[in-house]
Design a protein with these regions (language model features):
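A short, N-terminal "cap"/entry segment at the start of jelly-roll beta-barrel domains
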Residues: 1-38, 53
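Conserved short histidine dyad/triad with adjacent acidic residue
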Residues: 28-30, 42-58, 92
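Short, surface-exposed secondary-structure edge patches
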Residues: 43, 63, 77-81
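A generic "binding-loop/recognition-motif" signal
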Residues: 48, 59, 78, 94, ...
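Histidine-centered metal-chelating micro-motifs
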Residues: 51-53, 72, 88, 92-97
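Glycine- and acidic-residue-biased ligand/ion/polar-headgroup-sensing regions
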Residues: 59-61, 65-71
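Short acidic-glycine-tyrosine-enriched beta hairpin
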Residues: 77-92
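Ligand-binding loop in jelly-roll beta-barrel domains
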Residues: 92-114
Length: 114
């Protein structure tokens, strides 16, 4: 399967669930396109002042791969700064969050695996 950029759906989410502020999600692949082996494969843009609040992963795992910018993350209560090229894996039963306190957008790839 080849999917061209013009076929990638973009959604904006604001102050909903774990999201504080506004984020943009490029839904690169849908669960059906991944044969239901993953539930998310998105490029997320996190503007300055926005965050995805700490949340657990139960019966799944999530990967964040930073593409652009600088983000503050928590990994099971430990706070760290991540930059382009850095990756975080949150396994089953673990908690994480990501926030943008910089003056520039943060872009990252987010993938939830089953």
């Amino acid at each position: 399967m080849i999917k061209y950029s013009q076929d990638i759906r973009v959604e904006t989410v604001e102050n909903s669930g774990n999201i504080e502020g506004r984020i943009s999600k490029n839904i690169v692949l849908t669960p059906a396109e991944m044969l239901e082996r993953a539930s998310m494969f998105n490029i997320i843009t996190l503007p300055s002042g926005s965050r995805i609040k700490e949340h657990p992963h139960i019966d799944d795992a999530e990967i964040y791969y930073i593409l652009e910018g600088e983000a503050e993350v928590t990994d099971n209560g430990r706070t760290a700064i991540m930059r382009a090229g850095d990756v975080m894996f949150t396994g089953n039963g673990d908690c994480h969050s990501i926030a943008n306190h910089s003056g520039k957008d943060v872009k990252f790839l987010a993938c939830i695996l089953h």
